[in-house]
């Protein structure tokens, strides 16, 4: 927890945006939460509860909420964007002319830009220009547990070490550890791919394939992360840390994960539409699976688990057929000799 306070604008009043805004407010930072839904935002501001996404959990009295974006970012020391990946580009464009001079921009969004497959730091840099400090907040963290004050560890990676440290210091506290790094590519890759792989483990558990299968999918899923990391310039140690392995294990095993719950529903025979409707929130893996495989095809590498998830989500194969294909693959060395070189 830092010894000085910042005014922080948190953009996105879903479960994760609300949790991070509450965390920052509890640490003594004047924090404003911005959202589009006027009724929900008004309720948060008046009752200090996000009844839609975090029902029954009291938010700090000091936390303010508004639908006025200009008012939210005015005089902000830095801005934290926490919107779904499909809304990220638009949100960055909206804040570009409103951002106070010198204010850095961080985000806790996980995924790629839909359509282009670009990393989110590439999108932000393209829109905001070369001089704005940027950082990505990622790691194994369920919003509900953070809001309840349960122990959590995350990591902040940025292209400006001083700004990454500012963000980490503001978040760090008695039950919330915030580390720092400078591998934005690796941090964003881990945060995106774990959502796809969580669907795979959810499907396996929904089909009651056992704990051995789950462990195998997590481990081989990590291998796929490392394989893609090796060809796009990410560092393997980033994927072996909180941004990769940590987030992967949590999302693949914790039933608070929307992506795991999607897989569970598909493994039990539900349709994709019914499963998404039942979850009732954005499920990033549906779009991210396409972008992951676009990256893999561009670089000429195989990601069999991710590809099977993509095919199941598109209705091209059944979960049973996907499992059969994975088990029938030719055996190879567990790790290529070039993976860590």
Curated annotation (Swiss-Prot):
GO MF term set: glycerol-3-phosphate dehydrogenase [NAD(P)+] activity; NAD binding
Subcellular location, record wording: Cytoplasm
Chain residues that bind NADPH: 15-16, 36, 110, 143, 258, 282, 284
A Pfam family that the UniProt record links to this protein: NAD_Gly3P_dh_C
Residues annotated for sn-glycerol 3-phosphate binding in this entry: 110, 139, 141, 194, 247, 257-259
PROSITE patterns xref list: NAD_G3PDH (PS00957)
Catalytic activity: sn-glycerol 3-phosphate + NAD(+) = dihydroxyacetone phosphate + NADH + H(+); sn-glycerol 3-phosphate + NADP(+) = dihydroxyacetone phosphate + NADPH + H(+)
Biological process, per Gene Ontology: carbohydrate metabolic process; glycerol-3-phosphate biosynthetic process; glycerol-3-phosphate catabolic process; glycerophospholipid biosynthetic process
Keywords: Cytoplasm, Lipid biosynthesis, Lipid metabolism, NAD, NADP, Nucleotide-binding, Oxidoreductase, Phospholipid biosynthesis, Phospholipid metabolism
Active site positions: 194
CC terms in the record's Gene Ontology section: cytosol
E.C. designation(s): 1.1.1.94
Pathway in which the depicted protein is active: Membrane lipid metabolism; glycerophospholipid metabolism
Membership in a protein family: Belongs to the NAD-dependent glycerol-3-phosphate dehydrogenase family.
Function: Catalyzes the reduction of the glycolytic intermediate dihydroxyacetone phosphate (DHAP) to sn-glycerol 3-phosphate (G3P), the key precursor for phospholipid synthesis.
Protein name: Glycerol-3-phosphate dehydrogenase [NAD(P)+]
């Amino acid at each position: 927890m830092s010894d000085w306070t910042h005014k922080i604008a948190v953009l996105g009043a879903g479960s994760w945006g609300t949790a991070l805004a509450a965390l920052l407010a509890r640490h003594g930072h004047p924090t404003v939460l911005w959202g589009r839904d006027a009724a929900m935002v008004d309720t948060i501001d008046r009752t200090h509860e996000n009844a839609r996404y975090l029902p029954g959990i009291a938010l700090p009295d000091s936390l303010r909420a508004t639908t006025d974006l200009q008012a939210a970012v005015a005089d902000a020391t830095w801005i934290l964007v926490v919107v779904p990946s499909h809304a990220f580009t638009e949100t960055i464009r909206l804040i570009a002319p409103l951002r106070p001079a010198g204010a850095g921009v961080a985000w806790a969004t996980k995924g790629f830009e839909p359509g282009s497959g670009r990393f989110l730091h590439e999108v932000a840099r393209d829109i905001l220009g070369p001089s704005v400090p940027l950082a990505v907040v990622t790691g194994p963290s369920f919003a509900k547990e953070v809001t309840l004050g349960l122990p959590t560890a995350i990591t902040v990676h940025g292209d400006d070490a001083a700004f990454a440290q500012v963000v980490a210091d503001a978040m760090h506290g008695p039950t919330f550890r915030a580390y720092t790094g400078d591998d934005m590519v690796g941090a964003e890759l881990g945060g995106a791919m774990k959502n796809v792989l969580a669907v795979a483990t959810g499907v396996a558990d929904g089909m009651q394939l056992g704990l051995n299968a789950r462990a195998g999918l997590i481990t081989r899923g990590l291998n796929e992360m490392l394989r893609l990391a090796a060809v796009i310039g990410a560092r393997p140690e980033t994927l072996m840390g909180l941004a990769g392995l940590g987030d992967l294990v949590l999302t693949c095993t914790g039933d608070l994960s929307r992506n795991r719950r999607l897989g569970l529903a598909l493994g039990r025979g539900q349709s994709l539409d019914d499963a998404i409707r039942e979850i009732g929130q954005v499920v990033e893996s549906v779009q991210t699976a396409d972008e992951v495989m676009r990256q893999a095809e561009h670089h000429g590498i195989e990601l069999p688990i991710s590809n099977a998830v993509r095919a199941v989500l598109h209705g091209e194969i059944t979960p049973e057929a996907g499992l059969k294909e994975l088990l029938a693959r030719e055996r190879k060395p567990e790790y290529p000799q070039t993976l860590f070189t």
